[in-house]
Amino acid sequence: SKPMFMCYYDTTQTEHNTITREGQRVMNLIDDQLTITMYVNLLDKSAPAGMPENQMSNLRELKPFLRFKPDTRLKYVYFYDSTDHSRFRGATASLPLREQMLKICDDEDLDPEFFLSPEEIHRQIDLTSEGNRMIYLLERANGRKSFLRFYDGMDIRPRETEITVALKRLVTDASRIVFLTGHGERSLYWNDKGGLYSLIQRNGR
């Protein structure tokens, strides 16, 4: 069913199936068209989670938010390009990108025409700052944009907290963080496990 034609009633005592009040507030602040585009790089080792047969699994994470903005548009773009999260190692990784793509298509019975070439995807969007990994782009009609990342490990999909933070960037101005250096202050790149740099590492950039 299309979200705008669905009714919701959370019967759980703690509203377990409903996003937090903060998440609801953020969704209500988006008063124009919201488009969520999933970019899937076939050469990314996480790509299987973004293939068409898994779209419903990805929608499961977004659906509680779509309840509060049912006119949200969902789009999927499939491409192949170099990535810092490649499926391949060794000799295969040194093959031309198109040959890597064709190998995966042959192994997984996929249509090569389904995937945009690097040149074609570059005309749409530049994802190099994100390592050309699989990612969501959240975009408002007013031009504000925000990336929502997938993660390494067993549980790669963003959850409610990460989704809320990404949506919040569409309705609030980013805070500026300033670091003072040169007077004996602890370095931003201090490597202690409890230091900021360690936290940055653990949170994936």
Please give the residue ranges for each predicted region.
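Short, surface-exposed patches at the edges or C-terminal ends of soluble domains, predominantly
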Residues: 1-205
